[in-house]
């Protein structure tokens, strides 16, 4: 009996590595030392930072992965994986430096895995983050046929003096919300239930002319390059930032707000995108549940001083980023620190 007889095909793994090498190399930065295949991936941090603070993050894509597998859409789910990780470390002002992925399946399909890793490499390239390593695990009997799991890991760096930790947030600061590309990678257990119960055809078109399934599978927006540019040019105006993920607007922005302060969010400041309107209507989802489950069209939030908010908004306009002034920091209302209305 051989390892292949037991369900592990080493040759398929080697074929995958050869397929993805050119894709991965496109994401490399000058600091990357060596290529793929080593026991450890190397990154030279010596040249750019004086007092670097390393910021790490890890995440998956939730059950959006289940929907991607059902639809056979493997080429963009890797972008979601990168976005969930790099947008998180960006919150503290960090530039994502490198990324590693974990791909696990019962039987390795080289074409599927190459499509997934290609998306990861593309997400890294768009974020200026090097895909320097990963693990492909073929584990017979662990997963149903055709299914796989994903996890991502990133490390970023920020100068210690420029670290954003929320300490500068003040009463009266303004919340500037930057548009999301859709649900990103959160709320998909609810989304899948609504989608199944609604019985909507695959070709169902939303009010804006987008196919429903395209809106649901739109890759997570990558905020790294535009936000790092803002930090470089207008860093003094930004007191904190938030990535709107699981927990929605209700639970994410407040994570970077000091005790004693709260948030007033004006839900009329922007229009709920059609995909979220469809989900709320078809799922009979209450407003409060929408706010604490989905990003509702706001994927990233900048918290800025009132005096400099207009300048920051002009800089966002210059980058063609859709944005809205969605609220402000206020004294906390007892135990109720977040009000949306």
Curated annotation (Swiss-Prot):
It is an enzyme of class 6 (ligase). The keyword ATP-binding applies. One of its GO terms (cellular component) is cytosol. One of its GO terms (molecular function) is phosphoribosylformylglycinamidine cyclo-ligase activity. InterPro entries: PurM-like_C_dom (IPR010918), PurM-like_C_sf (IPR036676), PurM-like_N (IPR016188), PurM-like_N_sf (IPR036921), PurM_cligase (IPR004733). It is found in: Cytoplasm. The keyword Cytoplasm applies. CDD domains: PurM. It catalyses: 2-formamido-N(1)-(5-O-phospho-beta-D-ribosyl)acetamidine + ATP = 5-amino-1-(5-phospho-beta-D-ribosyl)imidazole + ADP + phosphate + H(+). Pathway: Purine metabolism; IMP biosynthesis via de novo pathway; 5-amino-1-(5-phospho-D-ribosyl)imidazole from N(2)-formyl-N(1)-(5-phospho-D-ribosyl)glycinamide: step 2/2. Its EC number is 6.3.3.1. It comes from the Bacteria. Keywords: ATP-binding, Cytoplasm, Ligase, Nucleotide-binding, Purine biosynthesis. One of its GO terms (biological process) is 'de novo' IMP biosynthetic process. Belongs to the AIR synthase family. This is Phosphoribosylformylglycinamidine cyclo-ligase. The gene is purM.
